[in-house]
Amino acid sequence: MITRKILVLFGLAFLATLGYGIMIPSLSVHAHELGASHSAIGVIISAFAAAQLLTQIPMGRLSDRVGRVYLVVFGFGLMAVAATLYHFATSANEFIVLQALAGVGAGSLWPALMAMITENVAPEERGRLMGAFNTVFFLGVGMGPLIGGLIASNLGRSAVFNAWTLVAILGALVCLFAIKETASDRRASAARARATKAADVQMVNAGFMATFTAALVVRARGGVCSSFNNALLPLYAVAMFEATPAMIGSIMFIHGLGLAFFNIPGGMMTDKVGRRLPILVGSLVATAGVLWYSAAGSYWALFAAVGLAGAGAAFSTPAIAALAADVCDPRRRAEAFGYFLTSFNLGMVLGSLVFGFVSDMVGLSGAVLTWGITSLVLSLFALAIRETLAQPRGMAVAGEARA
């Protein structure tokens, strides 16, 4: 199942999340020192997700037509440009523009990357594959802030932007030279796209639109959590426990670690019992962690709560990704993953904007509690999901035993 090409794709996913994560511990604190309010910081964080949200679906369609590699290289290139220009940003508006530029880069690379990973994989193996992919993805999410916090503490904030630039350039070069996509591959992609358009193929299989929509709502919950953590969690940790940049990076690292290592058991469970149950259980566990944020009486209690939130979210993510592949026509799979990714980014946009304003009105502690309640509401959409794995492996084994 894990081929050389998939290992390279996993490496590209790691580099994409590592580079952006390196910058995250410094961004909101730096913007706050330049005079940005909590709501302005929310806008800065949301600009990345908003740009990604607006570009992922058209870039997914473009990837189905012209091939995958060019879009991934282009995305890494835009991230490198944005990271370099951060050295010259001195106001909130300039941060917003650069976040948007980096978001366009992310919107270009992720649909193509995920489509390449899921191509030619049997449905009963998708959960484990996505679990392994998400483990690598979230290792980058966790290690980026940890490394970025250490860089900022020892070398200054400007050094984190240099590090992000180098990582993005490395990603572009690895994709360009390690992934082989021939002209005939691109012509075949274009031919499939033309045939799909001519046949007017539906993206979501008949009877599964409500299931697909409910899964996207739960996925959006993860986006809200990420934006909340990126925008307000560093400020909350500083206000409550006088956290240093290294301490903030450690909190984000444990969230990423939980996201990384609970994807594999989540993926295995997804292939064994189906998609619906892991989505529901994982999102509720994540909600328990978020509610614990507001009750944390010490830095280490907050550290544990953030880790629990990450673990729960990770357990549900492979099931949502596998469900998206299950219910969508293979000829429009990159577009489908565009919607999958867009739901996450919609959550990021709304989360950072809404909770930035909530924090200005009721304070950071009030915003934390409000987010916990919102997380519970979004998690309950999992109850509307219809099982998509035709015969979960555990049920199949039980049936064979009875026979």
How would you describe each model-predicted region?
Residues 26-38, 232-246:
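Short amphipathic helix-loop junctions that connect adjacent transmembrane helices
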Residues 98-137, 322-323:
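Cytoplasmic helix-loop-helix junction between adjacent transmembrane helices
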Residues 82, 93-101, 289, 300-308:
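Paired small-residue
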Residues 31-32, 62-63, 150-155, 237-238, ...:
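Interfacial helix-cap and linker-helix signal at transmembrane-aqueous boundaries
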Residues 1-3, 180-216, 399-403:
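Juxtamembrane intracellular "pre-TM" segments in multi-pass secondary transporters
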